[in-house]
């Protein structure tokens, strides 16, 4: 009796696998953070290598035509962002927004990557897109505040961080950003 060969993954297969990969990335990132806090550099490197491999696999899936491509680029972007490969991560998130221009989460991730590369004008643009598509989350507004502050647009930056604080008053990151902006403004 011949055993049938399974030669093609369905869209549902790709979707399920990519979501599993994304969830595993979050676990690995948490493990890497804990290992880093303990000073266990070999464990950090091991987790980062796994994260990179998952990113490469997700990018490979994204090269296969289908509805899953956007998710493949997104997971690949996350993996590269997690290991501070900012330019590659930004490229992946740009690919996501080319496919799905209203994907606010991809714009948010792109904002972060561009900021890490010191590309403040592009970071502002991505943050504005993120606030457009995810207007009721503090993260896009705080990222916009950071970009605007770096560009010397203090009044706009303060307005953006105040919006972030309105949306998420208990988020310590937003309060820290506001305090940092105020102290830097006082120094200048």
Q: For each predicted feature, which ranges?
A:
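Register position in tetratricopeptide repeats
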Residues: 82, 116, 150, 183-184
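Short coil turns that delineate tetratricopeptide repeat
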Residues: 66-67, 101, 135, 169
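Conserved structural position within tetratricopeptide repeats
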Residues: 63, 95-98, 128-132, 165-166
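Hydrophobic/aromatic packing residues within the alpha-helices of TPR/SEL1-like helical repeat arrays
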Residues: 55-58, 86, 93, 127, ...
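Helix-start (N-cap) detector for alpha-helical repeat units in TPR-like alpha-solenoids
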Residues: 70, 104-105, 120, 138-139, ...
